[in-house]
C-alpha cells in the first residue's frame, strides 16, 4: 500500500488578476499595468503546489458548467493532478477578483464561491474513503462550506489521515472538528481572528498556538510573512526564519507553503524539514507574478535550499 499521496479538498476558481500601483481607493479609477486570467482557488493552488513538490495529488472539489470549467480542469490535469473526484455542477465556476500592488506585491481579493459552495459533505466523504489507501495527508481550507470541513476532519480522524487545515478565510469552525486536525496553519491575522489574540511577537504567537492545541489540534503553525513561521506543538515551540527575497506578488505564498508542507509530510519528512521546505516554496512563489504560475517545482525548492547553506 503506497500512501505517499496528498488529497486536497478545496476551492477551484478562475483568478482574474489586475496589477498596478497604487491600488484604487473607494470611488477612484486608476490605470493598471497588466492582467491575467488563470486557474486559482486555495484548493487548486495547493493541489498544484503539492504535485509540483513531488507528491501524487488528488483534487476534491466542484466547478460549474460554464466557460471557466475547461480552463480550470485543463490546467489541473496538465499539471498531473488527478481530477476524477472533481464534481461538475449546474451554474458558475468560482471566481476570485485579485488586485496586486505592482510595487509592494501586496494584494486584496474578493471571492465569489459559486460551485465551491455546492460541494457536499457526502461528496467529500465518498472521495476520501476511496482514496484512503493512496494518501496519508489531506489539505483543506475554508473556501468550501464549513459542513464539508467538519466532515473532512471526521473522516481524517476515523481513517488516521494527517489533516492540514489552512483556516482562510478565517471563520469559526465546529469545536468537534479540531480533534481531526494534525496541523492548523493560520497566518498572524487569521490566528488573531480565530483566537482573539493579537499575534505580534513570539510570545503572542505561542499563546495563539496554545489556543488551537487546547481545542484539539495536534500542532499549530503560525506563518508570519517576512518573519517566517512559529510551530507550537507537544514538544515545545520552534521558530523558523523566513528566506530573504524581493516580493512581486504575495497572492499564492500561503498555498505554496501548504502544498510543499503536505507533500513533504506525505513522503515521510519530519515536521521541521517539511516546514523549511514550505517556507522555501513560499519564498520562491512571491518572486513570480500570478497564482498557479508562480508555484515552484521540487527541483527549484531543492536548489533554493541548497543555496542557503
Question: Over which residues does each language-model region extend?
Answer:
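Glycine-rich phosphate/adenosyl-contacting loop at the front of the ribokinase-like
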Residues: 1-62, 67-71, 77-78, 246-248
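Conserved phosphate-binding/catalytic region of the ribokinase-like
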Residues: 1-6, 172-177, 202-309
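Short beta-strand scaffold segments in enzyme catalytic cores
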Residues: 48, 95-99, 108, 228-232
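Alpha-helix C-terminal capping segments
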Residues: 48-56, 100, 263-268
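A glycine-rich helix N-cap at a beta->alpha junction
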Residues: 75-90
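Conserved beta-alpha-beta core of the PfkB/ribokinase-like small-molecule kinase fold
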Residues: 107, 124, 136-207, 227-229
Amino acid at each position: 500500500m503506497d500512501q505517499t499521496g496528498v488529497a486536497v479538498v478545496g476551492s477551484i476558481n478562475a483568478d482574474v488578476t489586475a496589477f498596478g500601483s497604487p491600488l484604487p481607493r473607494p470611488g477612484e479609477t486608476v490605470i493598471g499595468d497588466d492582467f491575467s486570467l488563470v486557474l486559482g482557488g486555495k484548493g487548486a493552488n495547493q493541489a498544484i503546489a503539492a504535485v509540483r513538490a513531488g507528491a501524487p495529488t488528488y483534487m476534491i472539489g466542484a466547478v460549474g458548467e460554464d466557460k471557466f470549467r475547461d480552463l480550470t480542469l485543463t490546467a489541473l490535469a496538465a499539471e498531473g493532478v488527478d481530477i476524477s473526484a472533481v464534481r461538475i455542477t449546474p451554474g458558475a465556476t468560482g471566481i476570485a477578483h485579485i488586485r496586486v500592488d505592482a510595487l509592494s506585491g501586496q494584494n486584496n481579493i474578493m471571492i465569489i464561491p459559486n460551485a465551491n459552495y455546492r460541494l457536499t459533505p457526502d461528496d467529500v466523504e465518498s472521495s476520501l474513503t476511496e482514496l484512503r489507501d493512496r494518501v496519508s495527508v489531506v489539505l483543506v481550507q475554508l473556501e468550501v462550506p464549513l459542513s464539508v470541513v467538519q466532515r473532512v476532519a471526521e473522516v481524517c480522524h476515523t481513517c488516521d489521515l494527517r489533516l492540514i487545515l489552512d483556516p482562510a478565510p478565517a471563520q469559526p469552525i465546529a469545536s468537534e472538528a479540531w480533534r481531526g486536525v494534525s496541523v492548523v496553519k493560520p497566518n498572524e491575522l487569521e490566528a488573531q481572528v480565530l483566537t482573539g489574540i493579537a499575534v505580534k511577537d513570539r510570545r503572542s504567537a505561542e499563546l495563539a498556538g496554545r489556543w488551537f492545541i487546547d481545542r484539539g489540534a495536534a500542532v499549530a503553525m503560525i506563518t508570519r510573512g517576512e518573519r517566517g513561521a512559529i510551530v507550537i506543538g507537544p514538544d515545545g515551540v520552534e521558530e523558523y526564519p523566513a528566506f530573504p527575497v524581493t516580493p512581486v506578488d504575495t497572492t499564492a505564498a500561503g498555498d505554496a507553503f501548504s502544498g510543499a508542507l503536505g507533500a513533504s509530510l506525505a513522503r515521510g519528512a519530519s515536521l521541521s524539514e517539511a516546514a523549511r521546505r514550505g517556507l522555501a516554496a513560499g519564498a520562491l512563489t512571491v518572486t513570480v507574478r500570478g497564482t498557479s504560475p508562480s508555484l515552484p517545482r521540487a527541483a527549484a525548492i531543492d536548489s533554493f535550499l541548497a543555496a542557503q547553506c
